[in-house]
Amino acid sequence: WWRAGDNFSIWVLLTIWLAMLAASVVFLIFKHAYRYALDADETPMEAPKRAPQTVLRAAEQLAESDKKALQESILEFTQEKVLRYVEKNVDIYSTNTFTLRSADLYNIKKLPNYRFDAIVNFMPLNQIRGVNKLFTTVNDKLPDNGIWICCYEPQSVTKRNILKRYPPVINWIYYILFFCYKRVLPKLFMTSRLYFDITEGKNRVLSKAEVLGRLCYCGFEIIDERKKGDLNYVVARRKFRPQIVERRLYGIFVKLNRVGKNGKVFKVYKFRTMHPYSEFLQAYIYDRYSLQEGGKFNHDIRVTTLGRWMRKCWVDELPMLLNLI
């Protein structure tokens, strides 16, 4: 029987045992976190192809008393300029227009298919969990070329309010932590479900590019987008229904195809410099912003603030060094 002082130190054995215990705990935590993140309830939203559809009933105008009541109810939670903007884009006083202010998806699901050719929700998307589910549900309820109006508080407004609320230096520290919590965690595979289970999707931070990109991904065409107060309002037209709408998660890296010698296609990695869902905005950006020299857009809303700096300094290209290994 050996003694601790002969060949082994009791402290070495204790250290090894603790290291193995810590590794086992980390492994079990990672294993269960991975299973939790898979979220078995999050299944892709599939839809069969549908025949061309028109609104079910001919439109009629509301009675004057109903028009006044609708105006008063809308002005209780929004400004008159918002009401005028909505009036400009849809006939809000038509029996074929449905208006609501709700974060509950049930209020959309219960609507008869193709009963309304315009749906307006005054509840900011920042307060709604399952934005893609909302968009696809609206898509299913609208007839062909139906109009969908929604609103959200853009990330730029959230940033401005935080920087104004706190003193210098502290405001930037708070904003960086806030950004990591509200923008980074919801987009990562391992933390996305945990984030939404804790916050229930309330007070989300959404960029303009992400909201417009989600709409295009879910089969809408952007007709107009205006800032009214602290909220951005988007008017979109239903164009098609994607066969499958899946949850999309984004990491810090993006994998791209490149063509090399003799036409050989290979993969390269870069740091992500664009907002989520930006890949669905190519046509929208092309239609609204002209190209500058070099084939880039004059005002590309898809690129993040950090991404502009990374592109300017070529930092986003650093992961391509892996191709040399």
Regions found by a protein language model. Give the residues of each.
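A short glycine-rich, Lys/Arg-flanked "PGG" loop and its adjoining helix->strand segment in the class I
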Residues: 132-147
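Conserved beta-strand signature within the Rossmann-like core of class I S-adenosyl-L-methionine
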Residues: 144-158
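Hydrophobic alpha-helical transmembrane segments
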Residues: 2-19
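Conserved small/aromatic sequence motifs within transmembrane helices
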Residues: 240-325
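A short SAM/SAH-binding and catalytic strip from SAM-dependent methyltransferases
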Residues: 115-135, 154
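A short acidic, Gly/Pro-enriched loop at the edge of an enzyme's catalytic core
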Residues: 106-118
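Core SAM-dependent methyltransferase catalytic element
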Residues: 212-247
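C-terminal alpha-helical "lid/dimerization" subdomain adjacent to the S-adenosyl-L-methionine
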Residues: 157, 161-212
